[in-house]
Amino acid sequence: MLLVHGFLGTRGTMMPLAKRFQDDGRTTFTYHHGTFQLRSLLSGAQELVEHIDRLQRTLGVERFDVVGFSMGGLIALQAVKFMQAHRAIRRLALLGAPTDGTWVGLLGVATMGLLSQSVWQCLPTSDFIADLRAAPLPPGLRVRQIHASQDALCPLPEPLEGIDRDHDFIVLPGGHSSLVVSHGFYRELKSFFEESHGDDARSPGGHDAEAAAE
């Protein structure tokens, strides 16, 4: 299990979530990908790919489950859509990821716009968000979007193309910080990663898509 933190976060922000996974017997990794994630999200995605590659070589593990929290979800999505990271990822959970962008980024532009490319990239009008939404999900990769209904930092987006709206677009009560500390959100993550492999037929290019094509 690999956890990817968000904007102005550090690996420490993911520790409550990491501890829950570890207590349930899952080997869980967090990692540092830039000071408070101020760099370009493209750089963050490349670093994620390199980190996964190092873990594969060090541990001898072929595939990982990944949770991308907030802007970390955009990083993970960039990695699987454009950098072939899906080859090393079994399932991806986007936890409060602003996949439609967020105007809260304007506050970041006012305070850190000269220092941080990422605050510009997460605006709803950015080319980064447009390209990220337009690119298809890789065939066979199961992705679940999990959101908080009162999340002021990440307003509820539309489901990504290829997401099963009935099963893999989850909205629960809470705010942005609830996503990594509330047991309800953890329960949804745990359920997603523990579902049987047969449930991956809902993924783009899965068995359901093949049956429809026939």
Task: List PLM regions with ranges.
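Serine-dependent carboxylesterase/thioesterase catalytic core
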Residues: 1-7, 11-12, 21-137, 157
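Typically the conserved alpha-helix immediately C-terminal to a functionally engaged Cys/Sec
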Residues: 17-18
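Helical cap/lid subdomain of alpha/beta-hydrolase-fold lipid enzymes
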Residues: 81-214
